[in-house]
């Protein structure tokens, strides 16, 4: 299993070997990230619980491909913007812990402003 640095290096090497960095500005990378996330969503649109379980079982490889595309854009964008994504994740989780204390949010899907 690759670590995050390995994933970033592989994504950057793939991009750079094709001379695509010229097309990778923050706006277009963010758009590509959103588009790939939307492709993940397409797999679940209009399916109820039973349909979804069967669909996931029979389309797991396709869903994995789309999630990997999302990971590609996270890796390249965070690299180019010099954002340590693991550090950003830790910082964000600390903020979320304050916004959603277990004592107020456990078992609820309410937004933090309504707790």
What are these model-predicted stretches?
Residues 1-67, 71-115:
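Flexible "arm" and connector segments at domain edges
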């Amino acid at each position: 299993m690759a670590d995050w640095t390995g994933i970033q290096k592989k994504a950057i090497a793939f991009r750079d070997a094709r001379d695509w960095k010229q097309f990778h500005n923050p706006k277009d990378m963010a758009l590509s990230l959103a588009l790939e996330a939307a492709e993940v969503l397409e797999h679940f649109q209009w399916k109820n619980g039973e349909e979804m379980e069967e669909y996931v079982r029979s389309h797991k490889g396709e869903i994995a491909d789309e999630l990997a595309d999302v990971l590609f854009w996270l890796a390249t964008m965070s690299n180019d913007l010099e954002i340590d994504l693991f550090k950003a994740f830790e910082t964000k989780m600390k903020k979320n812990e304050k916004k959603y204390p277990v004592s107020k949010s456990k078992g609820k899907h309410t937004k933090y402003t309504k707790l």
